[in-house]
Design a protein with these regions (language model features):
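Short, well-ordered beta-to-alpha junction loops that form the rim of enzyme active sites
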Residues: 83
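Conserved beta-strand-loop surface patch within small alpha/beta domains used
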Residues: 1-77, 86-147
Length: 147
């Protein structure tokens, strides 16, 4: 599936990861959409998490609250977005602990704690396949940034 990402959503994502990470820590947001318009990403949720050297951990209680909100609002998580300090890649921890474990789920990694220009240049996108493993995919084939 190719998701449509409003430029405003991308801008708000960069604002959030820059504020949360302060150029020193990883940060995560989740892009969601309604079940009746799956391809149209329209909200971001900043997970409650603890950042540590080399990663982050999402609070268990927040995850439970978040799933309940999604159910009430008839929404789903489509893309997990997080930052890395330097180059973008998917770490072993990223592979092991995604927020969603289903084929087709996407994880987008933004380099340099999101301090670079707003956009997807230098970002890394990966997808869970039916074999349960992550595989790098082409950003342009999966995410269309709308102006």
């Amino acid at each position: 599936m190719r998701y449509r990402v409003p430029h405003d959503l991308l801008s708000r994502t960069f604002d959030q990861v820059r504020t949360c990470g302060a150029g020193r820590r990883e940060c995560q947001v989740l892009w969601t959409s309604r079940w009746d318009a799956v391809a149209d990403l329209d909200q971001l949720r900043h997970s409650r998490h603890r950042s540590y050297d080399g990663g982050l951990e999402v609070e268990d209680t927040w995850i439970t609250e978040f799933w309940n909100e999604l159910a009430r609002e008839k929404r789903g998580v489509r893309v997990q977005v997080h930052t890395h300090p330097e180059d973008a890649f998917h770490s072993a921890s990223d592979d092991t602990w995604p927020i969603v474990h289903v084929p087709g789920f996407l994880s987008l990694v933004i380099p340099q704690f999101g301090l670079g220009p707003i956009g997807l240049a230098g970002a890394y996108l990966t997808e869970i396949r039916s074999d349960g493993r992550w595989h790098e995919v082409t950003i342009e084939k999966h995410l269309e940034v709308l102006r």
